[in-house]
Amino acid sequence: MEELQGYLKIDRSRERDFLYPLLFQEYIYALAHDHGLNKSILYEPMENLGYDKKYSLIIVKRLITRMYQQKHLIILTNDSNPNFFFGHNKNLDSQMISEGVAVIVELPFSLRLVSSPESKEIDKSMTTLRSIHSIFPFLEDKLLHLNHVLDILIPYPIHLELLVQTLRSWIQDAPFLHLLRFFLYKYHNWNSLITQKTKMILFFSKENQRFFLFLYNFHVYESESIFVFLRKQSYHLRSTSSRAFLDRTHFYRKIEHFLVDFRNDFHTILWLFKDPFIQYFRFQGKSILSSKGTPLLMKKWKYYLVNLWECHFYFWSQPDRIHINQLSNHFIDFLGYLSSVRPTPSAVRSQMLEKSFFIDIVIKKFDTRVPIIPLIGSLAKAKFCNFSGHPISKPAWADSSDSDIIDRFGRICRNLSHYYSGSSKKKSLYRIKYILRLSCARTLARKHKSTVRSFLKRLGSEFLEEFLMEEEQVLSFILPRISYFSKRLYKERIWYFDIIRINDLTNLS
């Protein structure tokens, strides 16, 4: 463990010791504003400050001074109007400064990445890896040769002070860390949102989005440090990275940066875990570690990771958060798909002179399916159907025009079809389409105070022509020269490289 601690400190010699003075620089807040924090406000209302939508050094100084006046914070709890604090919006105060803090705290990391000699080469390679679908061809190529997977939920710190102590290894500016600690305790519920999938949207809330995104990225960045030096023991460990996934960028670049700093004396310590076939991939708080090793080796991996996170990183990691599964009889729930490696038996007829015989062989096939039950649950939460999958009308959209209603339903249907174009079997997708189509018809019938049957009989089904467009028609537009094969292509898995975010219904499922 001492050798591991020494290794992890190798690249931490470039800390910026003086970050706190940057809080008083106006250009920091202008930078945070110009980088497009959606719906963020870097100034208080004019009636509160008396300034014409400006932020200045005086404002920032006053905000920081008020935030450190703990007595006033205590008095505030008994105030009848807790949203304002000496005539100012307390939430807006913290939001304004936290946006500046988010920009400043990223400096030690961004400067390291820019100065890295491999950064330009990595930037070029990222242009082809922006799509979420780019990970699935990689899985199809690699998982066929592996046997077991570790399904891991990344642990979270048990106390906020531990996160501050970890940040101290990168940032040694005490006043800045003190202010950062204030924000961590102000938003004390952030650590409960990291690994709970149902609350991921709350985690990336409208307020302080960049600040919390950095904390999450840094947390994952530290938890994945173990794979940096294990990469030398497992030469095939790779990471598919993309600028669209901010939480994966640091891991890829950290691997490239640490290549020259690896220490050979770890060879004798980690010999039990040397595995030439190991793959690691992650999205948000869930990661998958796959290997060709035996179940005993996977149990050693599990024991090793749990103890490493608890003893070195002080992360609370329950053993039941890591599940060992066999690829041949288990689905991997990842990025909205249920992926597995299924053995497919086949018979080969061989002819030798006058004799012929059959040879039974088993070929592994990468299988991806649509998770129908979670998707129906997501549609039920969005009020398109009940939890049994029975379509219902959407009353909230009944006030819109007919074309707007059809366009909304059609857009959702096409987006789901586009996202799940890589599914091996499309029957589940047909059921989702049926729910959306009938929900659209019920919504229109509700608007016109009619039944679905009479409404369709009176207007016909032509008004749903665009909504009912099948994927083979879409492929004929995308690939006009090979439209003859579009129907055949539709039956195959198709991965699109223009999908840069996971589907909302998929993410909520």
UniProtKB/Swiss-Prot annotation:
Q: Which gene encodes it?
A: matK
Q: Which organism is it from?
A: Clematis vitalba
One GO term in the molecular function aspect is: RNA binding
Which locations, inside or outside the cell, does it occupy? Plastid, Chloroplast
What are its GO cellular component terms? chloroplast
Q: Which family does it belong to?
A: Belongs to the intron maturase 2 family. MatK subfamily.
Q: Which GO terms describe its biological process?
A: mRNA processing; RNA splicing; tRNA processing
This protein's name: Maturase K
Q: Name one Pfam family in it.
A: Intron_maturas2
The entry's keywords: Chloroplast, mRNA processing, Plastid, RNA-binding, tRNA processing
Q: Which HAMAP family match?
A: MatK
Please verify whether the record's keywords include tRNA processing: yes
Keyword Ubl conjugation part of the UniProt annotation = no
Major localization class: plastid
Query: What is known about what this protein does?
Result: Usually encoded in the trnK tRNA gene intron. Probably assists in splicing its own and other chloroplast group II introns.
